[in-house]
Structure formats: structure tokens, C-alpha cells
Amino acid sequence: MSGELTEPGRARTNAMVRALERTATGWRLTIGSAADPEYLDADAVILATPAAPAARLLKDSAGEAAARLAEIPYASMAIVTLAFRGEDLFQQQSPAQQRSGYLVPAVDGRAVKAVTFSTLKWPHLAAQAPVHVVRCSVGRSGDVAVLQRDDEDLAALAAAELAGAIGITATPVARRVTRWGGGLPQYNVGHLDRVAAIRAAVAGRPGLAVAGAAYDGVGIPACVSTAKSAAAQVLAYLARPQALRAT
């Protein structure tokens, strides 16, 4: 798939973009270190970064969009993945185990805010039975203390809360902790108006579009939708005659 996405062009990874500026013919990206910068000219640019780096890149070329992007807060979280033997996991059936997972309201005071029974949710994982995978999302906005625990302690906490919530007391046969520092955008009151203002400001910059989780949701469908919309905007712009692209 990666080959098809870049054909007939090329993809560059691990290339830090330090600045973005509008030119007479499109956009110029400053890449690399300050001591040895590289300049890349582009007809159009899609920013698919989190809000903070997008705000930094747009500060000079789209100040209103940058200001509104800077208002979007982010929270940190961790995913604790636990693997159980099937006979251990389902010794005590609960309504939650017959679904794809459950959510935990903040009022409960638990560190785990959501649980997904991945093996039940995704049919292709069922082939891995008798090992079943359970994913626990840990961390809430404004609560960073729990994420200061080391991996072993955090995994033990998730397993304990799983037992307390739905009675799974089996010992996991494997565990993994994946941390996402500042990776979860928060959609506070006024977010829809904020996003509308960002998109209106960006629309006034020919050949520029934005996409990603900062706008319409963190789920894959929402992110794909923003990507399709951004791609359509850029394609429509590039379809214009060269002489009309600056307008």
C-alpha cells in the first residue's frame, strides 16, 4: 500500500519541517536543522499534524488559524494491552464480555477509562484464540499522576481494575504498555466554532488544507474523513490553470 500511495512520487520520512511560508507559486517548507536547512517548494500542502505544531507552522502565513489551533488542548494516555488464555478469561461470563468492551465514567474514580475486548471486536483476531487480547485505556484529561507509574505498575493497576469492574481475576500471560504523551485532543465547549474558524482561515490560503484528529474526532473514520476532504480541496486547487492558482 505504501508503494501505491507514493506512486509516481516519493515519500520522505523523518524529515522535520521547521517552517512553512507562502510563495508566489505555492509553498516553501524549511526542512532539517537550523544550521543546515533544506528548502522544498510545493504546489500545495496538507498539514496532518497535531494542533500545536500546525499552529507553529501557520503562525506567519495564517495567523488566525494558528491562534485558534493553539487553543486546542491535548491530554496524555496509555494503552495497557493484556493477553489472557481463553479458558481463564471466560470462566465467569459477564454482560461486558459478550460485547466489544465498555466505558468507565469519570465519577467512578478509576484509572482505566475504557476497555476493549479486541478478540471479540475484531474477527480476524479470533483466529489467535485460545489467547484473547484486552486493551485498557488509562488516563484522563487533567490527571497525569497515574501515568507517572512505571509500565509494570500501570499494567498491574489495569488488571486489578478489570477484576474489580467485571470479575476477571486471571493472570495475564503477556502485557504491553504503549504511551501516548499529549496525543489525545480535547473537544471543549466551543470546539465546533473553533474548527469552523480554522477551516475558514485556511480556505483563504490557496493550496493549503488541514487534516487529522484535532478537528472532527480521534477515531479512524473521522481522521480518514478529514484526510479525504483535505485531498479533495488540494486536488481541486491543482486542477486550476497555473495562472489562477494564486486566487
Residue map of PLM features:
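Helix-loop-beta segment of a Rossmann-like dinucleotide-binding subdomain
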Residues: 2-7, 138-141
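Active-site catalytic microenvironments for nucleophilic, acid-base chemistry
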Residues: 4, 53, 60, 233, ...
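A conserved beta-strand/loop element that lines the FAD pocket in flavoprotein oxidoreductases
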Residues: 5-18
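A structural signal for the hydrophobic beta-strands that form the central parallel beta-sheet
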Residues: 11-13, 47, 210
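Mid-domain catalytic core of redox enzymes
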Residues: 16-134, 139-148, 152, 164-165, ...
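Conserved flavin/dinucleotide-binding core of flavoenzymes
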Residues: 113-247
